[in-house]
C-alpha cells in the first residue's frame, strides 16, 4: 500500500485516540456479544481543478452485522426538513441576520453510545501482542446503526447546555 494511504489511516486512528472512541479489551462471551467487523473506506479530496490535495481514509463498522437488542436499540435521529432550512434562510435574509455554517470534524466519533458494542481490530493495524483482543466502543463509529442517534443526542445535550431549547 502507498505511504499516503498509510498516513491517512494513521490520521484516522489518531482521531480515535483523541476522541477516546474505544479501548482494547479481551474478547467477550460470543453468546452475549457480537463482534462487528471493520473496514477501510478510501477517498481522494480534490481541489476545484480536480487535483488530489489529500487522501482520506475512514474506518467504518460493518453495521449490517449488528443484531437488534444486542448491539443497538434506538436508531432514530431527526433530520432538518428542506422547507425548515429554506424558512430559516428567508428569515435570516429578511432580518439581515448573519448566519454561520459549521462542520464538526469526525462528528460521529463524538457521539456517546449506551450499548456495549465490540468491533474487530482494524485490518492492517492489528496489535501483534494482542491479536485475539477486540475494541469496546465508548463512542459511535461510522457505519453503526445507532451512530446518527448518538451524534444527535450529543449535539442536543451540548445545545441545551448553551441555553437552547428544543
Please place each PLM-identified region on the residue numbering.
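Long, low-complexity, charge-biased intrinsically disordered regions
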Residues: 1-166
Amino acid at each position: 500500500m502507498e505511504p499516503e494511504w498509510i498516513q491517512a489511516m494513521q490520521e484516522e486512528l489518531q482521531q480515535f485516540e483523541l476522541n477516546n472512541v474505544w479501548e482494547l479489551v479481551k474478547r467477550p462471551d460470543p453468546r452475549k456479544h457480537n463482534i462487528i467487523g471493520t473496514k477501510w473506506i478510501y477517498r481522494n479530496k480534490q481541489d476545484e481543478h480536480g487535483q488530489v490535495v489529500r487522501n482520506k481514509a475512514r474506518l467504518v463498522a460493518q453495521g449490517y452485522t449488528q443484531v437488534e437488542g444486542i448491539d443497538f436499540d434506538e436508531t432514530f435521529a431527526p433530520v432538518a426538513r428542506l422547507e425548515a432550512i429554506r424558512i430559516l434562510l428567508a428569515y435570516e435574509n429578511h432580518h439581515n441576520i448573519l448566519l454561520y455554517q459549521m462542520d464538526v470534524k469526525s462528528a460521529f466519533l463524538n457521539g456517546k453510545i449506551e450499548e456495549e458494542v465490540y468491533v474487530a481490530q482494524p485490518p492492517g493495524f492489528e496489535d501483534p501482542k494482542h491479536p485475539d483482543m477486540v475494541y469496546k466502543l465508548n463512542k459511535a463509529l461510522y457505519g453503526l446503526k445507532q451512530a446518527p442517534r448518538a451524534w444527535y443526542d450529543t449535539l442536543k445535550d451540548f445545545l441545551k447546555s448553551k441555553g437552547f431549547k428544543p
